[in-house]
Structures are given as structure tokens and as C-alpha cells.
């Protein structure tokens, strides 16, 4: 009997190990249903029952450059295979972003609506960077967040990040950032009284200690903290601990495994120290970034499918590490996602008369349409605007 029992236990362990190696981290298809409305209690992010919540997920890269990776299918894969429960849509303001091309907000809407359908949380990120002072485009920010909160304020999925990384020696919490937040937050609250708002802090969202000493009055505000494992270490962890001791709620809305440039590394040992630090303090986070860009913080390799279904070969060292970390802590039982089909498969019998199709227009938004350009037909594989057909890594697939 003892021998039979031993064999049975071994078989069970074998099945369990096989399952771990061949299924996903979590079937997070009921995250928001489970946690509901988020809020802040005693400096902690909590769900509608007052229980602590830790969100873990991915940030996009700039939507104006790598928006092809932000779509329902890729976000579903991240939820089902990686186990994410939050996704951050990084909409740059400058550098070809919203200020130059307001239509990029359509990709933000696509991400938000996908997150709502997938029942995960989503961060709408007003991604200031080279425009170091959030007040430069304050009026545009107010208009944008008025629109977003009016559209999505009734959904508990939504989190607003109103200033990604204020920076520069003349941009301080008390003189620039807090006054900016005190103008933008009421715009959101007019439409959405409850959802979480993340506010960036000085020195590229590192100076949470300054915000902690002079906090905003809104009860559901969190303060952004950003780090890159190859550059930032114990002194910044000490600043976070100080802020937490003052009762400030911290959200690590961007972090990378690389140096602060987004490249160099990958620094996995240092990243693990940070992962442990965040877990011990129940800090929510989003990793930078979901892109195939040739930099070490990118989660994907060049040529990766924009709609998910990524093989090990399509994940970068950073992406492999981050996926493993999210899977380790995902709290919902494993599922077995079906890799999505490639929406970019060309029509096997393209029409012979190009005259039936419109010429490519750089001002037009395309999602799956066919256009005529430079003597041939092209079909959009994902959302695109002002990206000319012909780039082998771009959104257009040749049909003839």
C-alpha cells in the first residue's frame, strides 16, 4: 500500500510539473469583477472590500511609434499568458505624440476599451518627458482628461496618470507639479469622482519624498515613482520608504530592467532586488515596455507578432524575466490561451484592379483597409496613421 501511495504521489507531482510548464500564469478574466472600485486607504491601494491590491502589468512604448502592439489580441495574450491585471497606455505629448497629432488618442481609446472588455485595469498615461514641465501643455491636458473621464469615468477599470515624468532643476513639486495637479484633478473629478489618479513627481518621477511632505487633498491620489534597475538603487528605495512612512500612496507606473536610457543591461539581479522591494511593500507596477524596439528594456524581439502569441524566441531577455515575475505572483488559476491568428495575413486572391481601392492617405486612420500605393496594394495589419506602406516592420502587408 505504501508503494502504491508513493507511486500515486509521484504521478501527481509529475502531472503538476507538466501543467506548470505548459499552461499560463493566470486566467485573469475577472480581475475588475473580483476587485471592483479601487481606492486608497491608509496609503494602500485597496479593492471595494478594503483588501490590499497589487497590480502588475506592462506599459506600452510611445503609442505614436509602437501603437501596433496595443490591441485587443495582444492585451488578451498579456492577460491570459503573462497574467497581467493592468496595462498602461503611454501617450506621449511631444515627440510626435498628442500635441503634434491628436489622433493618437484613438489608440488610447482602443486600449481602454480592450481593457474594459478584458476586465483588467488600464492606465491612461499623459506621457510628458522632453516637455519637462507639465504646465507647458496644461490646457491640452485638461481638455484631454475631460474627454477621457467623460467617456470612461463610469468604469472602475480606469486609472489616470496625469504627468508621466516631470523633470528639470526648475520643475519642483511645490511650484509646478502640485499646482498643475490641482487644476487637472478637478476636471477629472467633475466626471469621475472615484477612480485612482496617479500624479508624477520631480526628477523623472523619483522625488516621491517631496510629494509626501506636501500631499494633494484628493483622497484617491497616488504618487508616481519610476526606476531603472541598472541606474537606480538603495537611495531611491529609501526615498520610497520615507514617502510610505508619511502615508503617501505610491504606484510604480514605470520601471525597466535596463539603465535609465531604456538601453544597456539587462540588469536582472538588480531588477530582482526591486521586485522583492515592491512585493514586500505591496507596490503596484507597470514594466517598460511592450515593443520590439532595439533596446534592452523592450519586452519583444524584432519581428514579434503585434497581436501576441509570442514564443520564447520572440521574447527579449527583459520580456522573459518580466513575464516570469508576473506569472509567479498571478493569483488566478492557470488557463491555456489560444495563440491569436495573424490579422495581417494577405488576401490570397487580391483584386486585380487597383483602381477599386483608394490611394494611401497619410492623414487617414487605417485598421484593416486595403489601399493602393506605389504601384501595388497594401492591407493594414493594425491601427496606423501616417506610416507609409513599404516598411518591412510597419503595419502594411503587400497584397500583390
Swiss-Prot record:
Main location: secreted
GO BP annotations, alphabetical order: cellulose catabolic process
Amino acids binding substrate: 61, 65-66, 92, 127, 228, 260-261, 288, 293-295
GO cellular component: extracellular region
Alphabetical list of SUPFAM superfamilies matching this protein: (Trans)glycosidases (SSF51445), Carbohydrate binding domain (SSF51055)
Ranges of Pro residues composition bias in the record: 334-353
Keyword Cytoplasm: no
Family indicated by similarity: Belongs to the glycosyl hydrolase 5 (cellulase A) family.
Subunit annotation: Monomer.
Protein name per UniProt: Endoglucanase 5A
Amino acid at each position: 500500500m505504501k508503494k502504491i501511495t508513493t507511486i500515486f504521489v509521484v504521478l501527481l507531482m509529475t502531472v503538476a510539473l507538466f501543467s506548470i510548464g505548459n499552461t499560463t500564469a493566470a486566467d485573469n478574466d475577472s480581475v475588475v469583477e473580483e476587485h471592483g472600485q479601487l481606492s486608497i486607504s491608509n496609503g494602500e491601494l485597496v479593492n471595494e472590500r478594503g483588501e490590499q491590491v497589487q497590480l502588475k502589468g506592462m506599459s506600452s512604448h510611445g503609442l505614436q511609434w509602437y501603437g501596433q502592439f496595443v490591441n485587443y489580441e495582444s492585451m488578451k495574450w498579456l492577460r491570459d499568458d503573462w497574467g497581467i491585471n493592468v496595462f498602461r497606455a503611454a501617450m506621449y505629448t511631444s515627440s510626435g505624440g498628442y500635441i503634434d497629432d491628436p489622433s493618437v488618442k484613438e489608440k488610447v481609446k482602443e486600449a481602454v476599451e480592450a481593457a474594459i472588455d478584458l476586465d483588467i485595469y488600464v492606465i491612461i498615461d499623459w506621457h510628458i518627458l522632453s516637455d519637462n514641465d507639465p504646465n507647458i501643455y496644461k490646457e491640452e491636458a485638461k481638455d484631454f482628461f475631460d474627454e477621457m473621464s467623460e467617456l470612461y469615468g463610469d468604469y472602475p477599470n480606469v486609472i489616470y496618470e496625469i504627468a508621466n515624468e516631470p523633470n528639470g532643476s526648475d520643475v519642483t513639486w511645490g511650484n509646478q507639479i502640485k499646482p498643475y495637479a490641482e487644476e487637472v484633478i478637478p476636471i477629472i473629478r467633475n466626471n469621475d469622482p472615484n477612480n485612482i489618479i496617479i500624479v508624477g513627481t520631480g526628477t523623472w518621477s523619483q522625488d516621491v519624498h517631496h510629494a509626501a511632505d506636501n500631499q494633494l487633498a484628493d483622497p484617491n491620489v497616488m504618487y508616481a515613482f519610476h526606476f531603472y534597475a541598472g541606474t537606480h538603487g538603495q537611495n531611491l528605495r529609501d526615498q520610497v520608504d520615507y514617502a510610505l512612512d508619511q502615508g503617501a500612496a505610491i504606484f510604480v507606473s514605470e520601471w525597466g530592467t535596463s539603465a535609465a536610457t531604456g538601453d544597456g543591461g539587462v540588469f536582472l539581479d538588480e531588477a530582482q532586488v526591486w521586485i522583492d522591494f515592491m512585493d514586500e511593500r505591496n507596490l503596484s507596477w507597470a514594466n517598460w515596455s511592450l515593443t520590439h524596439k532595439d533596446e534592452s528594456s523592450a519586452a519583444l524581439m524584432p519581428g514579434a507578432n503585434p497581436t501576441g502569441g509570442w514564443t520564447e524566441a520572440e521574447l527579449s531577455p527583459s520580456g522573459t524575466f518580466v513575464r516570469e515575475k508576473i506569472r509567479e505572483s498571478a493569483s488566478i488559476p492557470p488557463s491555456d490561451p489560444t495563440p491569436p491568428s495573424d490579422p495581417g495575413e494577405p488576401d490570397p486572391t487580391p483584386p486585380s484592379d487597383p483602381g477599386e481601392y483608394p490611394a494611401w492617405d497619410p492623414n487617414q486612420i487605417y485598421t484593416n483597409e486595403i489601399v493602393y500605393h506605389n504601384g501595388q496594394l497594401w492591407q493594414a495589419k493594425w491601427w496606423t496613421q501616417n506610416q507609409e506602406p513599404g516598411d518591412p516592420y510597419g503595419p502594411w502587408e503587400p497584397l500583390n
